[in-house]
């Protein structure tokens, strides 16, 4: 159970060893492996090379000796490899040497000594990677091997090559890229979900830049794919055999096992990587970098870390990668050894340890974003790692927040008057807006412009760092290499200097100006960030919405915006009030084209969802908010979405609390803030984790952080109790009741299938008079013009299965199911479906090709803006001008754009929009929080949640019924007011819905701002709270006085104001007449007097 603290004290009291005392030396940490058969194997290799005849006889032994004795490869490698494989490696290396001399002679250039890039992958998931790099020196022993070459190409060429190599030894070429095969190791082994855990060892030849990497599939004592559970006590004692690769465990010292056990414990306790640097106890010239993290929580991290060594011109001697088969999470540990006496001279000037400390700091940054869009600028060392990540994030920000429309578009709209029924002009304007947004300043254009102006980006980065890098004194900063580099950059003193600089170097009609100015706006909008916190899983920013969202495009400025960038996603969170509630949705894209479309719309979608939520939340104390996480293309699996969600949440928490286990951050906000999340598309299964995680991170508001939790945590699952669907169904049923359709057959179309919350409950709650004609969901399209079997649909809904599991034997001759994976199939009416996904995505506009008519359409799923002015004509009868679907209840948020809603109603459709129909879930969430606030912890755990057996308490069951009743009541009240006002003045229902929400929210804000009722009429205040607002069953448990003491005063105020505002408007309409309001309050006062 969530409240069980029995294990926490024991773990905290464990005697945690010091990492510095456990790293002895590379020779001691890993035992020297004795391979008795090495000499015999060596002779077999010589024989094989001799038989093959590629290497001259008098050079074979020298080449073999060099490989066996000069590259620093330990005997463990030789014991595991066959003579055939070793001979192949030696052939590859020898061929590269020949290549050097041939190019020196014929091209007149001095190429790298070992210009080699080769990989060998065997059938047993074993691989060897060989790659050279610049900065190669040439040893005397190697020169003996090349005596033949001097005869062939001449001593002058050889001597010239040696001089060049010697020069490179002193100063590594800044333009040289890091090892390119490192990213292939990531892709083939570390990030490949079909690949089992592996063990990796890399060796750098002491006198060259030749890197040899050996990868082996890990072998565990207990090869359980689910991993092995292991206690913290065992980890700290180094008892890790059950989760370790057999070879690693065999060759590791006891100290090394304890060290790895400690790192594993630290990784299990918190999110993100554990990164440590220590000197070896026995070899003071040796420094060891250790990085531990959960596998699949980042991508291309191995290559990113190696590129960091390259950037700081550090040369490791050995790189070990160990994988551990831990329950729930495979954990990877990098163990990298560096010797000071093997480093380049210019590295020694600024201290190897200082460089490694900088690597330690930036390894956390690269864990969050291992691949950035400015890799080439970074490789040229024109950007530091931090500058490259800053530019990467800045480019994403610019792509989403740059004002592409400009003043010309705004001036155009000010010169024309668009009537709401002029769909042609509305469509032209919408198309122009979309074209301006989609076809100007692509992401790549932004990146190219920023790369060109890298010096300006560096100056803006310094402006950003000067504000947000938290430090006690400049003296502390001067110790880091990044500060020493930053000190050389002159920032912009103010906006005037920035503008003058741009005007001096960039033409005034260049798009570069807009890009760079938007990056400056990004800097100014940042109120807090975790960018400089070392242990982070993604990078988060709290932005000032007044600076990044123009009034022209976003008429109502939000209260706050969060912006999060991770290695597999970008995320946003928009809220319209300080205390606000809304779900977090995940948007997946199966391919790049879909991703590009989703990316273009994500900010508008997030804003519209949050705005809709603000209107939906008119009945509850909290304002509206919404979060959207957009995953990189192709990431659609459950575990991939969870990683993104968990990193999004953790990064947000970083800048919501002051975590004593992390560094401080600069907070430019005048007060602390709290966010309240809820489930939405793709995140319903993650809310329990987020609740527990907030508790683990000691968030004081963890109980109310997430709603829709499992009942064992005090949550009320929306899907299990149909909370959202109850509101939608109330509107459907009221339409039938009002228009006398209850006993008439109604033909129905639904998007969102029986596997989802809204779709399944809509099926289960459907009335007997409804006949389903078509349903579509993530698996495809199910349609039957003669009606779908209701019992079969209910079976799928109960089992939460997709329509792909529908028993097609129960379809008529004209019925069909088309999978999203289908291609080139013929339907019963002769229609050819070329692509199943395209057919599914457009079926809602094509349905009348397969059915004669539809009476009611209930969208319960689907992408926002699925019906727009651009496809409106599919829903309008050309002959009559009437809407082909007479009734629409928009259960899915934003399924229909507001202009399209107006147009549909103009053509006679009776349409109830999302902000009215889809508000049951937020009511449930709000009342879930109310229960946790009204009851003390003891009552909440033992009386509300109940025992640990899973049986829900009587109080819980009664409260659920209370919540369901309130949802239906609020929906029916709003329906009545919407219907009456529509009948009274003919205003479109969707417009009245907006006016209703605005009126309630405005009155609510005015009442919150006023202290009159709260301070001066305690009798009325307490009567309303205890008799009208807070459910009686909670008061019966806690007592009236305790309830009022348990709930924070600020929350009681908004409880009172939201009740008064919504109740008044539902009774009196959208005209807030002061006389009517006084009468309303007077009536409540008389009720309070009568009840006294």
From Swiss-Prot:
Q: Which InterPro entries match?
A: Aminoacid_DH-like_N_sf, Glu/Leu/Phe/Val/Trp_DH_C, Glu/Leu/Phe/Val_DH_AS, NAD(P)-bd_dom_sf, NAD-GDH_2nd, NAD-GDH_euk, NAD-GDH_N
How does inactivating the gene affect the organism? Answer: Leads to rapamycin resistance when grown on glutamate as the sole nitrogen source.
Q: Known EC number(s)?
A: 1.4.1.2
Does the keyword S-adenosyl-L-methionine feature in the UniProt annotation? Answer: no
Please write the reaction equations for the catalytic activity of this protein. Answer: L-glutamate + NAD(+) + H2O = 2-oxoglutarate + NH4(+) + NADH + H(+)
Additional observations: Present with 7400 molecules/cell in log phase SD medium.
Assembly, per entry: Homotetramer. Interacts with NNK1.
From the Swiss-Prot or TrEMBL record, give the protein name. Answer: NAD-specific glutamate dehydrogenase
Q: Which organism is it from?
A: Saccharomyces cerevisiae (strain ATCC 204508 / S288c) (Baker's yeast)
